[in-house]
C-alpha cells in the first residue's frame, strides 16, 4: 500500500538527524563515531523504530534526497579537472592502482564473509561496499543483496577510512600525494575524498578519480565474479 505520509517528513527527519550529527562532530573535535553521515543514519533508524514509522513512510521524502547522490558523485570531477596534468602524466599508474584495489576489495570481502559463515544474501550485500551508495545499491539489488545492509556497509566503511585513513597512511609511510589520494578514494569513497581535501588539492583530485573508477570497476567486476561464487 502506498504511503500517505507527506514527502516533507523524510526530508525533515534527514536534515535534523544530519544537523545533530554535525553539531556532535564539531563539539567532539572530530571524534570519528560522530561523523555526521553515521550519526544521521543511526538517529534515523532509532527515530523510525521508536515512532513506529515504516521505511516507506520515511522514504516518500527520503528518496528525494537520494536523487541527488548521482549529481553529487559527478561533482567529484571538479578537483580532478584542476589536476588534469598529473592525470595525463601518471594515468597508467593511477588506473592500475585503482583497478587492483577495487578487485582486492571484492575478493577480501568474499573471503572474510565465507570464513565467518555469512548468509549468501548478506555476503552479496557486502560485495559492492567499495563503491559509492549511488552505485552500490543498484548492484546489490541486481545480485540478490539487501540494499539496507549495503547502505550500512558503504557508510561504515567510509567512516572507518575517514577516522583512520590518515593514521594508516602515516603508519605505512605513504608520503606521495598521488598515492595518498588514490588510497583514500579507493577505500573510503566520498569520505575518503573529504580526507583528501583536508590534505591538499592533489590528494583530493586523486581521491575523486578513484571514487569514479572504483564505481565503474565494481559494476563490471561483481557480475563477472558472481558465477564463480554462486
Curated annotation (Swiss-Prot):
Keywords: Cell membrane, Cytolysis, Membrane, Transmembrane, Transmembrane helix. The chain crosses the membrane at residues 5-25, 30-50, 61-81, 92-112, 126-146, 149-169, 177-197, 209-229. It is found in: Cell membrane. One of its GO terms (cellular component) is plasma membrane. The keyword Transport does not apply. One of its GO terms (biological process) is killing of cells of another organism. It is a multi-pass membrane protein. It comes from the Bacteria. The keyword Signal does not apply. Inhibits the expression or activity of extracellular murein hydrolases by interacting, possibly with LrgA, with the holin-like protein CidA. The LrgAB and CidA proteins may affect the proton motive force of the membrane. May be involved in programmed cell death (PCD), possibly triggering PCD in response to antibiotics and environmental stresses. NCBIfam families: PRK04288.1. Belongs to the CidB/LrgB family. LrgB subfamily. This is Antiholin-like protein LrgB. The lineage of its organism: Bacteria, Bacillati, Bacillota, Bacilli, Bacillales. The gene is lrgB.
Amino acid at each position: 500500500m502506498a504511503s500517505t505520509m507527506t514527502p516533507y517528513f523524510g526530508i525533515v527527519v534527514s536534515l535534523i538527524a544530519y544537523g545533530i550529527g554535525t553539531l556532535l562532530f564539531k563539539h567532539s573535535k572530530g571524534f570519528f563515531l560522530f561523523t555526521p553521515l553515521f550519526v544521521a543514519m543511526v538517529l534515523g533508524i532509532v527515530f523510525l523504530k521508536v515512532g513506529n514509522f515504516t521505511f516507506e513512510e520515511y522514504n516518500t521524502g527520503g528518496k528525494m534526497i537520494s536523487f541527488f547522490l548521482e549529481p553529487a558523485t559527478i561533482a567529484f570531477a571538479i578537483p580532478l579537472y584542476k589536476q588534469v596534468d598529473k592525470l595525463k602524466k601518471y594515468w597508467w599508474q593511477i588506473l592500475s592502482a585503482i583497478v587492483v584495489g577495487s578487485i582486492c576489495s571484492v575478493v577480501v570481502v568474499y573471503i572474510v564473509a565465507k570464513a565467518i559463515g555469512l548468509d549468501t544474501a548478506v555476503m552479496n550485500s557486502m560485495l559492492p561496499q567499495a563503491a559509492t551508495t549511488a552505485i552500490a545499491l543498484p548492484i546489490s539489488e541486481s545480485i540478490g543483496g539487501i540494499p539496507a545492509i549495503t547502505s550500512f556497509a558503504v557508510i561504515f566503511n567510509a567512516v572507518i577510512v575517514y577516522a583512520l585513513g590518515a593514521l594508516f597512511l602515516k603508519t605505512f609511510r605513504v608520503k606521495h600525494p598521488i598515492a595518498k589520494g588514490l588510497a583514500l578514494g579507493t577505500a573510503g569513497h566520498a569520505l575518503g575524498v573529504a580526507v583528501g581535501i583536508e590534505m591538499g588539492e592533489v590528494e583530493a583530485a586523486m581521491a575523486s578519480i578513484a571514487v569514479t573508477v572504483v564505481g565503474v570497476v565494481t559494476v563490471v567486476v561483481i557480475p563477472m565474479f558472481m558465477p564463480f561464487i554462486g
